[in-house]
């Protein structure tokens, strides 16, 4: 069973990157990385889904999800080691995947300071904010 990793006092500002290393749990069909203001305000919900070979990104504002952005790209599998870089820019997020592919998702909520990070479905070995 996966455990959730959560940081509630993140100090991520525009121009900064978050580097994550970890191992995807063996018993999951997806994992998530969330960045935002709190559990109910997510500027970026990043959710690779293995059974669909798709990466889903979205925004949560209160109880309202935005329109999903789906990208058909598969470089993740249960039990694999991963390195990801999430770069927070004024107008968007850039996510660099383990295979070098990158995707961009708009900063729909417009915040310039992120306070919240959660990850689920991963065993984190390191994360670095720079």
Curated annotation (Swiss-Prot):
Query: What are the record's GO terms for cellular component?
Result: galectin complex
Q: Which UniProt keywords apply?
A: Lectin
Kindly list the biological process annotations in GO that this record carries.
Answer: cell-cell adhesion; positive regulation of apoptotic process; positive regulation of inflammatory response; T cell homeostasis
Show the GO MF annotations: carbohydrate binding; galactoside binding
The highest taxon in the source lineage is Eukaryota
Keyword Endoplasmic reticulum attributed: no
Any Pfam family matching the protein: Gal-bind_lectin
Q: Which of this chain's residues are annotated to bind a beta-D-galactoside? A: 65-71
Task: List, alphabetically, the InterPro entries matched.
Answer: ConA-like_dom_sf, Galectin-like, Galectin_CRD
Among its keywords, does the record have Ligase?
Answer: no
Q: Where is the Galectin domain?
A: 4-130
Q: What's the subunit arrangement here? A: Homodimer.
What does this protein do, in the record's words? This protein binds beta-galactoside. Its physiological function is not yet known.
Q: What is this protein called?
A: Galectin-2
Organism lineage reads as:
Eukaryota, Metazoa, Chordata, Craniata, Vertebrata
Gene name of this polypeptide: Lgals2
């Amino acid at each position: 069973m996966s455990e959730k990793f959560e940081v509630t006092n993140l100090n991520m500002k525009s121009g900064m990157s978050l580097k994550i290393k970890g191992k995807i749990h063996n018993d999951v069909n997806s994992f998530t990385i969330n960045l935002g203001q709190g559990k109910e305000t997510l500027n970026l919900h990043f959710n690779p889904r293995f059974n669909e070979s798709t990466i889903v990104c979205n925004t949560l504002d209160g109880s309202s999800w935005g329109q999903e952005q789906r990208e058909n790209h598969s470089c993740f599998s249960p039990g694999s080691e991963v390195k990801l870089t999430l770069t927070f820019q004024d107008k968007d997020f850039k996510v660099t995947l383990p295979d070098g592919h990158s995707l961009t998702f708009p900063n729909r909520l417009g915040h310039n300071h992120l306070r919240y990070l959660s990850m689920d479905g991963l065993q984190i070995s390191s994360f670095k904010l720079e």
